[in-house]
């Protein structure tokens, strides 16, 4: 019966087109990366056939003896990678990881404090269009106008004034290190839980290149892709197993049913890869590439928000060049360089236009790009933005990309 099924040519033609787009372009979106072949093999395995509601040793379905071992392997590797006492690898996404944690630590109507989306925060840190902004009272902190760095004095003042139940540290567009110790001191002062969302920089934490939030946070959430280079999914960590038990119940049966065990297998592979010495060298190059690319663009007259970066990403203020983020994204996309338009701190333009772009180096570093090649990448970006798209420039980008094979 199965052997007579007709191949879905239309769908697989689209997959081939997407593979061609990825192979022939430069991926500079900070939240994207290329997984290894063994991660793809795990995610595409027969594990996708199995339902496994519950947790290892406590399932609501039979036949989970192998699945239990797969999930347990992912849990133990996650704990070892980040130095955590407890881990939940079932969240389908970072947003669902955050939702479960909030629901475990707060009641609807309680006060949540997080970084303003306009300053670099994430939708789930209190945006009014997100569940976090609808279920909870939200207080947002931002950055200083003069330095574009987090204003810890403002964080403390707002915390003392509003007494939040949860304070979130973490962002989707902040290029500098976080002072987790200072955030924990503020949280303790007002009796709040500190939740760190390390979705963007988890891989750098694993490699020892970014401060680890586990010694300070009550709970840490993350995605498993981005700098961690795994499949798309979520992860929750804590050094408090009692809090972990509460969060377990909120993931299942609270907001999810059956876990995606094929994706959890891919997470296990990614954790295994991140535990290898090679991952530290990869992560070092991610940061060095970001620093060098930011420096090269600054040398060409672009203003880099905060003056540089400590991690895998940076923001470019395009106003000195007379461009919007939307225009820049479109021009770069036309020559095969993918970035995303992004608001800069105190941006006067609307979110669908923006004054800036966000650039990240995890994906091109996976393909073997080195700091010595960043001047060329900066030159291609500069030419696309100032001269506009051309077939000749598109071909230059294509040749450069093909010289760095995808995994």
Curated annotation (Swiss-Prot):
Complex and partners: Homodimer.
Taxonomic superkingdom: Bacteria
Segments passing through the bilayer: none
Annotated positions binding pyridoxal 5'-phosphate: 51, 94-95, 172, 200, 225, 258
One MF term in the entry's GO annotations: glycine hydroxymethyltransferase activity
Annotated positions for site Plays an important role in substrate specificity: 225
Organism: Thermus thermophilus (strain ATCC 27634 / DSM 579 / HB8)
GO annotation, biological process: glycine biosynthetic process from serine; tetrahydrofolate interconversion
Family statement: Belongs to the SHMT family.
Cofactor(s) demanded: pyridoxal 5'-phosphate
Pfam families cross-referenced by the UniProt entry: SHMT
Compartment(s) where it occurs, according to its Swiss-Prot or TrEMBL record: Cytoplasm
Protein name per Swiss-Prot or TrEMBL: Serine hydroxymethyltransferase
PANTHER family the record matches: SERINE HYDROXYMETHYLTRANSFERASE (PTHR11680), SERINE HYDROXYMETHYLTRANSFERASE 1 (PTHR11680:SF35)
Catalytic reaction equation(s): (6R)-5,10-methylene-5,6,7,8-tetrahydrofolate + glycine + H2O = (6S)-5,6,7,8-tetrahydrofolate + L-serine
Coiled coil: none
A single GO cellular-component term on record: cytosol
Protein's job: Catalyzes the reversible interconversion of serine and glycine with tetrahydrofolate (THF) serving as the one-carbon carrier. This reaction serves as the major source of one-carbon groups required for the biosynthesis of purines, thymidylate, methionine, and other important biomolecules. Also exhibits THF-independent aldolase activity toward beta-hydroxyamino acids, producing glycine and aldehydes, via a retro-aldol mechanism.
Lineage: Bacteria, Thermotogati, Deinococcota, Deinococci, Thermales
Keywords: Amino-acid biosynthesis, Cytoplasm, One-carbon metabolism, Pyridoxal phosphate, Transferase
NCBIfam families the record matches: PRK00011.1
Modified residues (N6-(pyridoxal phosphate)lysine): 226
Biological or metabolic pathway of the protein: One-carbon metabolism; tetrahydrofolate interconversion; Amino-acid biosynthesis; glycine biosynthesis; glycine from L-serine: step 1/1
Major location category of this protein: cytoplasm
Listed InterPro entries: PyrdxlP-dep_Trfase, PyrdxlP-dep_Trfase_major, PyrdxlP-dep_Trfase_small, Ser_HO-MeTrfase, Ser_HO-MeTrfase-like, Ser_HO-MeTrfase_PLP_BS, SHMT-like_dom
Binding residues annotated for (6S)-5,6,7,8-tetrahydrofolate, in chain numbering: 117, 121-123, 242
Enzyme Commission number(s): 2.1.2.1
């Amino acid at each position: 019966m199965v052997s007579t099924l007709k191949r879905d040519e239309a769908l697989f033609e689209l997959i081939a087109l997407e593979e061609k787009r990825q192979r022939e372009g430069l991926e500079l979106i900070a939240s994207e990366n290329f997984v290894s072949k063994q991660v793809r093999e795990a995610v595409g395995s027969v594990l996708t056939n199995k339902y496994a509601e519950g947790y290892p040793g406590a399932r609501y379905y039979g036949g989970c003896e192998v699945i239990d071992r797969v999930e347990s392997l992912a849990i133990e590797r996650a704990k070892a990678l980040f130095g955590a006492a407890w881990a939940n690898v079932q969240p389908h996404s970072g947003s669902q990881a955050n939702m479960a944690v909030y629901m475990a630590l707060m009641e609807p109507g309680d006060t949540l404090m997080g970084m303003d989306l306009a300053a670099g925060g994430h939708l789930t840190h209190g945006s009014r269009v997100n569940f976090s902004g609808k279920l909870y009272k939200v207080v947002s902190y931002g950055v200083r106008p003069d330095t574009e760095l987090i204003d810890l004095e403002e964080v403390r003042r707002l915390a003392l004034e509003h007494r939040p139940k949860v304070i979130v540290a973490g962002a989707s567009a902040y290029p500098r290190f976080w002072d987790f110790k200072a955030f924990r001191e503020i949280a303790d002062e007002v009796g709040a839980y500190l939740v760190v969302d390390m979705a963007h920089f988890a891989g750098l934490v694993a490699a020892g290149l970014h401060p680890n939030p586990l010694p300070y946070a009550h709970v840490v959430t993350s995605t498993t892709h981005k700098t961690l280079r795994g499949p798309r999914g979520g992860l929750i960590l804590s050094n408090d197993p009692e809090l972990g038990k509460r969060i377990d119940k909120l993931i299942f049966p609270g907001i999810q049913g059956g876990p995606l065990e094929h994706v959890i297998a891919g997470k296990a592979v990614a954790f295994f890869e991140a535990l290898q010495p090679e991952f530290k060298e990869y992560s070092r190059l991610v940061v060095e590439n970001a620093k060098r690319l930011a420096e090269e663009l600054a040398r060409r007259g672009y203003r880099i928000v905060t003056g540089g970066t400590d991690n895998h990403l940076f923001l470019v203020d395009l106003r000195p060049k007379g461009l919007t983020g939307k225009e820049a994204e479109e021009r770069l996309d036309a020559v095969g360089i993918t970035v995303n338009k992004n608001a800069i701190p105190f941006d006067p333009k609307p979110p669908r236009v923006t004054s800036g772009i966000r650039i990240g180096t995890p994906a091109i570093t996976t393909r073997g790009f080195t700091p010595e090649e960043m001047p060329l990448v900066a030159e291609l970006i500069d030419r696309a933005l100032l001269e506009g798209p051309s077939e000749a420039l598109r071909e230059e980008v294509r040749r450069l990309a093909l010289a760095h094979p995808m995994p």
